[in-house]
Amino acid sequence: MNYTQEMNLVSKSGYCMPFEEKKGEVNLTLGYGKQIHPVTQEEFFHHGVDFATHRYILTAVADGVVSGIGSTPTHGLYQVIRYGKYEVTYAHLANALAPFGARVRAGSVVSISGDLLHIEVKYDGEEINPMEFLAMLYGNLLAMRQQGHPD
Protein backbone atom coordinates (compact mmCIF):
# COMPACT_ATOMS: atom_id res chain seq x y z
CA MET A 1 0.00 0.00 0.00
CA ASN A 2 1.23 3.50 -0.78
CA TYR A 3 0.86 5.73 2.25
CA THR A 4 -0.37 9.30 1.90
CA GLN A 5 -0.82 12.23 4.29
CA GLU A 6 -4.59 11.67 4.28
CA MET A 7 -3.96 8.30 5.96
CA ASN A 8 -2.64 10.01 9.10
CA LEU A 9 -5.05 9.30 11.95
CA VAL A 10 -6.67 12.44 13.39
CA SER A 11 -7.95 12.39 16.97
CA LYS A 12 -9.16 15.30 19.12
CA SER A 13 -8.48 13.31 22.31
CA GLY A 14 -4.88 12.65 21.28
CA TYR A 15 -3.16 9.31 20.76
CA CYS A 16 -2.17 6.34 22.86
CA MET A 17 -0.37 3.09 22.19
CA PRO A 18 -2.69 0.08 22.61
CA PHE A 19 -0.88 -1.24 25.68
CA GLU A 20 1.79 -0.23 28.14
CA GLU A 21 4.73 -2.56 28.43
CA LYS A 22 4.85 -3.86 31.99
CA LYS A 23 8.61 -4.42 32.18
CA GLY A 24 9.85 -2.02 29.52
CA GLU A 25 9.54 -4.41 26.59
CA VAL A 26 7.10 -6.78 24.98
CA ASN A 27 8.01 -9.59 22.63
CA LEU A 28 6.65 -9.75 19.11
CA THR A 29 6.00 -13.47 18.72
CA LEU A 30 4.71 -13.53 15.14
CA GLY A 31 5.01 -10.86 12.46
CA TYR A 32 2.81 -9.82 9.56
CA GLY A 33 2.91 -11.59 6.20
CA LYS A 34 4.44 -14.92 5.22
CA GLN A 35 5.41 -16.90 8.30
CA ILE A 36 6.28 -20.43 9.34
CA HIS A 37 3.70 -21.85 11.74
CA PRO A 38 5.45 -22.47 15.08
CA VAL A 39 3.73 -25.85 15.60
CA THR A 40 3.09 -27.31 12.11
CA GLN A 41 6.16 -25.72 10.44
CA GLU A 42 3.97 -24.96 7.40
CA GLU A 43 4.20 -21.63 5.58
CA PHE A 44 1.14 -19.40 5.87
CA PHE A 45 0.15 -15.74 5.56
CA HIS A 46 -0.37 -14.07 8.93
CA HIS A 47 -2.89 -11.21 8.66
CA GLY A 48 -1.78 -9.48 11.85
CA VAL A 49 0.95 -9.40 14.48
CA ASP A 50 1.12 -11.29 17.76
CA PHE A 51 2.61 -10.06 21.02
CA ALA A 52 3.40 -12.08 24.16
CA THR A 53 1.14 -10.46 26.73
CA HIS A 54 -0.45 -11.69 29.92
CA ARG A 55 -3.56 -9.85 30.99
CA TYR A 56 -2.37 -6.50 29.63
CA ILE A 57 -4.81 -3.61 29.84
CA LEU A 58 -5.63 -2.57 26.26
CA THR A 59 -6.60 0.99 25.44
CA ALA A 60 -8.16 2.88 22.58
CA VAL A 61 -5.45 4.46 20.43
CA ALA A 62 -7.55 7.50 19.41
CA ASP A 63 -11.17 8.67 19.12
CA GLY A 64 -13.22 5.73 17.89
CA VAL A 65 -16.24 3.45 18.15
CA VAL A 66 -16.39 -0.22 19.14
CA SER A 67 -17.77 -1.71 15.92
CA GLY A 68 -17.55 -5.42 16.67
CA ILE A 69 -17.21 -8.02 19.41
CA GLY A 70 -17.30 -11.75 18.89
CA SER A 71 -15.52 -15.06 19.17
CA THR A 72 -14.02 -17.46 16.63
CA PRO A 73 -12.22 -20.79 17.04
CA THR A 74 -9.05 -19.24 15.55
CA HIS A 75 -8.90 -15.93 17.41
CA GLY A 76 -11.02 -16.53 20.50
CA LEU A 77 -12.66 -13.42 21.91
CA TYR A 78 -12.04 -10.38 19.72
CA GLN A 79 -12.98 -6.70 19.62
CA VAL A 80 -12.99 -4.35 16.64
CA ILE A 81 -12.61 -0.58 17.03
CA ARG A 82 -13.09 1.86 14.16
CA TYR A 83 -10.91 4.98 14.17
CA GLY A 84 -12.01 7.04 11.17
CA LYS A 85 -11.08 4.93 8.12
CA TYR A 86 -8.98 2.57 10.28
CA GLU A 87 -10.38 -0.63 11.75
CA VAL A 88 -8.27 -2.28 14.46
CA THR A 89 -8.97 -5.78 15.75
CA TYR A 90 -7.68 -7.03 19.11
CA ALA A 91 -7.96 -10.84 19.42
CA HIS A 92 -7.20 -13.60 21.96
CA LEU A 93 -8.77 -11.42 24.64
CA ALA A 94 -9.49 -12.39 28.23
CA ASN A 95 -12.24 -9.76 28.40
CA ALA A 96 -13.81 -7.09 26.17
CA LEU A 97 -14.73 -4.24 28.51
CA ALA A 98 -16.04 -1.58 26.11
CA PRO A 99 -19.39 -2.74 24.70
CA PHE A 100 -20.48 -2.74 21.07
CA GLY A 101 -21.30 0.81 19.96
CA ALA A 102 -19.29 2.49 22.74
CA ARG A 103 -17.51 5.70 21.81
CA VAL A 104 -13.92 5.65 23.04
CA ARG A 105 -11.16 8.23 23.41
CA ALA A 106 -7.39 7.83 23.38
CA GLY A 107 -6.41 5.98 26.54
CA SER A 108 -9.89 4.59 27.30
CA VAL A 109 -9.62 1.04 28.64
CA VAL A 110 -11.34 -1.23 26.10
CA SER A 111 -10.26 -4.80 26.89
CA ILE A 112 -7.85 -7.15 28.66
CA SER A 113 -5.49 -9.35 26.66
CA GLY A 114 -5.01 -13.05 27.19
CA ASP A 115 -1.51 -14.55 27.16
CA LEU A 116 -1.26 -13.56 23.50
CA LEU A 117 -2.48 -10.41 21.75
CA HIS A 118 -3.23 -10.56 18.04
CA ILE A 119 -3.69 -7.19 16.27
CA GLU A 120 -5.03 -6.73 12.73
CA VAL A 121 -5.47 -3.37 10.99
CA LYS A 122 -7.43 -2.31 7.92
CA TYR A 123 -7.50 1.08 6.25
CA ASP A 124 -10.60 1.83 4.19
CA GLY A 125 -11.25 -1.93 4.06
CA GLU A 126 -7.73 -2.85 2.91
CA GLU A 127 -5.49 -4.89 5.20
CA ILE A 128 -2.24 -3.18 6.23
CA ASN A 129 0.77 -4.20 8.31
CA PRO A 130 -0.12 -3.43 11.94
CA MET A 131 3.50 -2.51 12.72
CA GLU A 132 3.27 0.36 10.22
CA PHE A 133 0.06 1.54 11.92
CA LEU A 134 1.75 1.37 15.35
CA ALA A 135 4.73 3.31 13.97
CA MET A 136 2.34 6.04 12.74
CA LEU A 137 0.74 6.22 16.20
CA TYR A 138 4.15 6.53 17.83
CA GLY A 139 5.05 9.31 15.39
CA ASN A 140 1.84 11.14 16.30
CA LEU A 141 2.67 10.80 20.01
CA LEU A 142 6.16 12.22 19.46
CA ALA A 143 4.75 15.14 17.44
CA MET A 144 2.29 15.94 20.25
CA ARG A 145 5.10 15.90 22.82
CA GLN A 146 7.17 18.26 20.68
CA GLN A 147 4.19 20.63 20.56
CA GLY A 148 3.97 20.54 24.36
CA HIS A 149 0.88 18.33 24.67
CA PRO A 150 0.86 15.78 27.50
CA ASP A 151 0.67 12.07 26.62
Where are these regions (language model features)?
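Conserved, short, structured surface segments that act as functional micro-motifs
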Residues: 28, 77-82, 100-151
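Surface-exposed, glycine-biased beta-strand/turn segments
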Residues: 1-77, 105-106, 143-145, 149-151
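Short acidic/polar mixed-charge low-complexity motifs
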Residues: 56, 86-87, 126
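Zn2+-dependent peptidoglycan hydrolase active-site motif and core
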Residues: 44-47, 60-97, 115-121
